[in-house]
Amino acid sequence: MQTLAQHLTSQAVNDSLSQLILTLADTSKAISHAVRHGALAGVLGATEQENVQGETQKKLDIITNDMLKDALKADGTVRGLASEEEDHVVEVSTNGQYLVCFDPLDGSSNIDINSLVGTIFSILPASAGELTETSFLQSGRNQLAAGYVLYGPSTMLALTTGQGVQLFTLHPETNEFLLTNAAMSISADTQEFAINMSNQRFWEAPMQTYIADLLLGKIGPREKSFNMRWIAAMVGDVHRVLSRGGIFTYPTDNKDPKKPYKLRLMYEANPMAFLVEQAGGKASTGYETILDIQPTHIHQRVAVILGSANEVDACLSYHGLDYSEEPGLD
């Protein structure tokens, strides 16, 4: 089996980008270690602090954020970083070539119940000149690499550098990420969907109708039965989609009119959309392809519909859109 470093060499990824990806992977090993120690290390539970999103921070949110910041500052290739847990972008090095956006611990509300969590990251090119928030406001099409690390029964890294999606598994003895799936592929059709049904009454009418038709199964207009899955961590739900197909959505809702969207564009939706498209799927807000969005601020939120291409098309048809001719992967 190829190691991560060997794989990057085989794909002719340039040295500086390879170094950065390896730094993120090595840091994820340390995060995996911290997550596995859990209550034994006293890292469970919440703090009294809130992040810029107004969300109460878990202890591990802060710990993992600091681990990634320290590693990226020492790497030498990073110009600046943006994190879910940072109010503003952070300047790292005036000589860095890359910008890194990340969610250090996606699904951290699952920590106290020992369920799935993960790290999501996106790598963008850095431009010359002063580093500001505007430096980061690039469409998802500009991503040079993206991926996530899933901390589950085994620790797995899903990665794309624009050459498909590869899956690596952390070997528990050698502590090396080894290539275990060289070409992840999302089936075009599916009978699984993932959505937070508790928000149903707050969704827009097109999404309410779409889900109602799925629940009708064989007796409804879709003429087939669907199963629902929900992990309450985007990283876990998207991993399932990449592994066996499906559709994952966190749609627009009016539960809080000031916050109609849940997921963050720069460090959740964009990297996941890049992975999904590279695996043959599609990713949309319901009205716009995620990777084509021009960001307006670093913590911008968007609606997300992603997964099996034909099912995403079916969902979009309820929104009055026809994306059937738009390829998910060139």
UniProtKB/Swiss-Prot annotation:
Q: Which organism is it from?
A: Shewanella sp. (strain W3-18-1)
Positions of Mg(2+) 1 binding: 84, 103, 105
By what name is this protein known?
A: Fructose-1,6-bisphosphatase class 1
Picking any one GO biological process from the record gives:
sucrose biosynthetic process
EC identifiers of the protein? 3.1.3.11
Location in or out of the cell:
Cytoplasm
Which pathway does the database say it acts in? Answer: Carbohydrate biosynthesis; gluconeogenesis
Q: Which Pfam families match?
A: FBPase, FBPase_C
Residues that hold substrate according to the record:
106-109, 196, 262
The answer on whether this UniProt entry bears the keyword Transmembrane reads no
According to the UniProt record, what class of enzyme is this?
Answer: hydrolase
